[in-house]
Amino acid sequence: MAHSVKIYDTCIGCTQCVRACPTDVLEMVPWNGCRAKQIASAPRTEDCVGCKRCESACPTDYLSVRVYLRQETTRSMGLAY
């Protein structure tokens, strides 16, 4: 089941979320916006099972990676109107 995965620019490039993902949804890509020169990316969201282990592994206070489960996304879209 595909879920929406959003990586925010508060990512520090630590790779914790990538290592925590049991289905290999995340990978690191080059980015000059942080000291590590890399940021998490979610190229395979169709494999996301919604376990949110990536969120739990994120050491930033900003929760740089967020998984929006299908029902959460639908609910959020309804509030936008």
From Swiss-Prot:
- Co-factor requirement: [4Fe-4S] cluster
Q: Which UniProt keywords apply?
A: 4Fe-4S, Chloroplast, Electron transport, Iron, Iron-sulfur, Membrane, Metal-binding, Oxidoreductase, Photosynthesis, Photosystem I, Plastid, Repeat, Thylakoid, Transport
Molecular function as annotated in GO: 4 iron, 4 sulfur cluster binding; electron transfer activity; metal ion binding; oxidoreductase activity
Q: Which SUPFAM superfamilies match?
A: 4Fe-4S ferredoxins (SSF54862)
Please give the superkingdom of this protein's source.
Eukaryota
In the bilayer, the protein is annotated as: Peripheral membrane protein
PROSITE patterns in alphabetical order: 4FE4S_FER_1, 4FE4S_FER_2
The protein's matches in Pfam families, at most eight in alphabetical order, are given as: Fer4_7
Q: Which residues bind [4Fe-4S] cluster 1?
A: C11, C14, C17, C58
Where, subcellularly, is it found? Plastid, Chloroplast thylakoid membrane
Leader peptide range in chain numbering: none
> Keyword Thylakoid, does the record have it?
yes
Q: What is its EC number?
A: 1.97.1.12
Indicate yes or no for the key word Repeat: yes
Just give the chief location class.
Answer: plastid
What's the top EC group for this one?
Answer: oxidoreductase
Q: Which PANTHER family does the record match to this protein?
A: PHOTOSYSTEM I IRON-SULFUR CENTER, PHOTOSYSTEM I IRON-SULFUR CENTER-RELATED
List, alphabetically, the NCBIfam families matched: PS_I_psaC (TIGR03048)
Q: What is this protein called?
A: Photosystem I iron-sulfur center
Q: Which organism is it from?
A: Welwitschia mirabilis
